[in-house]
Amino acid sequence: MAGLYFHIPFCKRVCAYCDFYKSVDLRRMDPLLESMHRELDARREYLGGEPVRTRYFGGGTPSLCAPEAIAGLLDHAATLFDCAAAEETTLEANPDDLTPAYLAVLRRAGVNRLSVGIQSFDDACLKLMNRRHNAAQAVEAVRSAQREGYENITVDLIFGVPGFGNDTLRRSLDSALALGVQHISAYHLTVEPGTAFGRRAARGQFAPVDEATSETEYALVHETLTGAGFEHYEVSNFALPGFRARHNAAYWHGVKYLGIGPAAHSFDGRERHWNVASVTEYIGGAPAEAETLTDRDRFNEYVMTRLRTAEGIDLREAERLFGKERAARVLRDAEPWLKSRTLVLAAGRMAVPPARMLVSDAVIETFFETEPDTATK
């Protein structure tokens, strides 16, 4: 099974924390869509005939794209790839874009999962992050989608925001739960260079929360959501049973996927490809770059993706994929983490307990192989 990803990079305004590739020049929407259709045609053989299981529109703000244009991309893809078994089609959306009329056309087009970028139900926090909706609009967007018949809705929340502590976070979690959504992604705020927050931090006007605050807020997220019946299945992701994000799971398990649009990434099982991060250059036909994954790359990605999930590393699978020596080394390197209970080993699987997944990156680094890679081309 394979996945399709469509990158719509446009935004009406830039959020204070965002370091993804985006553009605020909405006049380029039509030329971009034409180029995306051309790319679909040009890469029709990329997935090697594998059935497409998931389709995902990310950004940027895909909900700025007319629903008819979303339908056009899906319909075109269906003529090139085997999409008959597609079971999850997700569109990322800003709350203020989700009008009843928009939702109705989108659903008829085949979108059956919405990812709503709420981030907070606190208006002051939303203003700080330069979001263009308020809490009331967020609530109404989800309710409108539910009235339209959407039964698979995920919302994004951000924690670790300076000046907004446990009480604000708890209210946002409670508000999300009260809406009856099936999935919640809770991301820790990162202050990246080149963002509004990053520039303020460089001037000494904005400071990230400390480690203790991060751990306390993460524990609150974990306890609140698991207490409400959600499965904590990946560092930042929580789902009711049966509603885990299938498209993201494809990335974590090495499934083939084709990315369409500027800055989109693809994987054909052997090589990674990525498009130029420029609307102008993409429309101009700039070729994708490529990297052949070495055995070391595949091992590092395996460790990284598995240890960010509740499933963890299946040591028998690791031995089958990478050999007995590597699997034995993983177990040896894990000893300090196992002794501290930061890693647990049960039934041949080694994982970070979900409540402690915030530290998974530090654990993952233990296992990385760092010899130089010369496979980029």
Q: What is each PLM-predicted segment?
A:
Residues 349-353:
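Minor-groove-contacting beta-hairpin "wing" of winged helix-turn-helix DNA-binding domains
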Residues 1, 22-45, 50-324, 376:
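C-terminal scaffold of the Radical SAM
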Residues 324-338:
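Short amphipathic alpha-helical interaction segments
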Residues 7-20:
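Local cysteine-cluster metal-coordination motifs and their immediate loop/turn environment
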Residues 355-377:
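Short, amphipathic alpha-helical interaction segments positioned at domain boundaries
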Residues 338-348:
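A short, conserved structural fragment
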